[in-house]
């Protein structure tokens, strides 16, 4: 009986040490406040809450050149940064989060604008021009039909890529050239942020 109690105590101590180790690693991996280098007339970024997702009717808008509210974050280094989101609903890009590939980052700003920037030379390549539409916080997801949308806190779409078609599942990838593209399961490129694709 004493051996059984001793084994239970030893197991409890080991579990406690593991939990403390995991909690310490989680705290150490969370970035502290990052420095923001704003473009003219920009706003600073602060952490926001996440939101639960629901399917809504898509809104389509045509993206154009970056807006004056564009900010370029100096992103803290991460061990395994995301460079893509997939249509299975597991990956959602929240405000303060970025897709990263080399010197390029695609980020959701506090005003609801999705922007692609070159973090090395602090330039903006493309923005969705969806600033101040809907109500913060905003998030980006790739829906189950292949349409990539920014949604507000009420799950209303404020901007969508307009892509519907191809083979499921879809993948939105920030490429090494800084373009954000949607491909279907077969690898067919259906939409890209900064270049026109043939119909």
From Swiss-Prot:
Major location category of this protein: secreted
Transmembrane domains' residue ranges: none
Cell compartments where the protein resides: Secreted
Biased composition (Low complexity): 49-73
Residue span of region Disordered: 35-74
Ranges where the Bulb-type lectin domain occurs: 84-195
Domain of life: Viruses
UniProt xrefs under SMART domains: B_lectin
UniProt GO molecular function: carbohydrate binding
Signal peptide from the UniProt entry: 1-25
Protein name, per record: Putative lectin L633
């Amino acid at each position: 009986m004493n051996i059984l109690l001793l084994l239970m105590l030893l197991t409890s101590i080991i579990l406690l040490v593991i939990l403390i180790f995991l909690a310490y690693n989680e705290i150490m991996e969370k970035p502290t406040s990052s420095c923001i280098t704003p473009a003219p007339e920009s706003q600073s970024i602060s952490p926001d809450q996440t939101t639960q997702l629901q399917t809504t009717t898509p809104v389509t808008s045509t993206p154009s050149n970056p807006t004056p509210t564009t900010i370029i974050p100096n992103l803290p280094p991460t061990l395994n940064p995301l460079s893509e989101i997939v249509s299975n609903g597991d990956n959602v890009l929240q405000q303060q989060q970025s897709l990263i590939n080399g010197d390029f980052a695609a980020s959701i700003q506090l005003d609801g604008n999705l922007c692609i920037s070159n973090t090395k030379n602090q330039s903006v390549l493309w923005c969705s021009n969806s600033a101040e539409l809907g109500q913060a916080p905003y998030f980006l997801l790739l829906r189950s039909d292949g349409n990539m949308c920014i949604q507000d806190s009420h799950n209303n779409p404020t901007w969508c890529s307009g892509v519907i078609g191809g083979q499921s599942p879809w993948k939105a990838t920030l490429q090494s050239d800084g373009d954000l593209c949607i491909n279907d399961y077969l690898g067919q490129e259906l939409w890209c942020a900064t270049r026109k694709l043939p119909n």
